[in-house]
Design a protein with these regions (language model features):
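Hydrophobic residues in alpha-helical segments
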Residues: 50-51, 60, 82-83
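Acyl-donor (CoA/ACP) binding surface of acyl/acetyltransferases
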Residues: 2-45, 49-54, 89, 93-199
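A short hydrophobic/aromatic micro-motif that marks alpha-helical segments and, especially, helix-coil
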Residues: 67-69, 82, 186
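Conserved GNAT-fold acetyl-CoA-binding loop/helix
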Residues: 57-77
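A short helix-loop-beta-strand connector motif used in the catalytic cores of GNAT acetyltransferases and
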Residues: 77-91
C-alpha cells in the first residue's frame, strides 16, 4: 500500500480500518465545507488558490508551483494513490461557492504506536474565517471513528502562530518546542508539537 502526502511524497501506509464497508478518503460534509477526493481537473483552482502563492508556502516544505501543469501532474499521482484504502487526502471545497480552497491529509503514520501526523494548507483568501478548524475537526473525528489510531499529532513552524491557534481550537494539546527540528522555505526552523488522543 502507498499514499501521497500533502507535500508530494509517496510513503507506506500504516494503520487498520475498523470494520467499515468503505475506506480511505471518504466524502465529509460540514456546515460550510465539502471535504472530498481531489482530481486532476482541480489543478487550476489548486494552482490559483494556494499552490502558486509564496504567502501560503512560507512555512511549508515545498516551494510554490510555477505552472498549473505541474500541479496537474501532482494530482495525477494523487489520484493513483486513492486506489489505496489507506490514503487520506481531502480537498477542502467551500459549499456556497464550490471553490476549492485548500487541502488536508494524513502526512505520516507510525503503526507501531498507532499514531498519525496530519497536515493542512489553505489559500490566503480564506484565512481567519475558521475554515481550517472546521475541516480539521471533521477529519480528526473521521479518523478516530474509521481507524484504530490512538494519537493524532501535528507540527508547525514556531513562527506560524496561527497554525498553533487552529490546533488548540480543535482540542489539540501543546507538547513542546523542538529546536531546529524542521526545514521549510524559511530554512531550518524550530517546530511546535501538538497532539490529540483518542477519548
Amino acid at each position: 500500500m502507498f499514499r501521497l502526502d500533502i507535500y508530494g511524497k509517496i510513503e507506506k501506509s500504516c494503520f487498520t480500518q475498523k470494520g467499515r464497508d468503505t475506506m480511505g478518503t471518504e466524502r465529509i460534509l460540514t456546515e460550510r465545507l465539502i471535504l472530498r477526493k481531489m482530481v486532476v481537473a482541480d489543478h487550476i483552482q489548486m494552482f490559483r488558490h494556494w499552490a502558486n502563492d509564496p504567502a501560503v508556502t512560507t512555512y511549508l516544505t515545498w516551494e510554490p508551483y510555477e505552472n498549473a501543469e505541474d500541479v496537474a501532474a501532482y494530482l495525477a499521482l494523487n489520484e493513483q494513490a486513492y486506489q489505496s484504502e489507506e490514503h487520506f487526502y481531502w480537498g477542502i471545497e467551500e459549499k456556497e461557492t464550490r471553490h476549492l480552497i485548500g487541502a488536508i491529509s494524513v502526512v505520516r503514520c507510525h503503526p507501531e504506536i498507532k499514531t498519525m501526523e496530519i497536515g493542512y494548507v489553505l489559500g490566503t483568501d480564506w484565512w481567519h474565517q475558521g475554515y481550517t478548524a472546521e475541516a480539521l475537526t471533521a477529519v480528526v473525528d473521521y479518523l478516530f471513528a474509521a481507524t484504530s489510531v490512538q494519537r493524532i499529532e501535528a507540527f508547525h513552524d514556531a513562527e506560524n502562530k496561527n497554525s498553533g491557534n487552529v490546533l488548540k481550537k480543535c482540542g489539540f494539546t501543546y507538547e513542546g518546542l523542538l529546536k531546529q527540528r524542521g526545514k521549510n522555505n524559511r530554512g531550518i526552523v524550530d517546530e511546535c508539537l501538538y497532539s490529540r488522543l483518542r477519548d
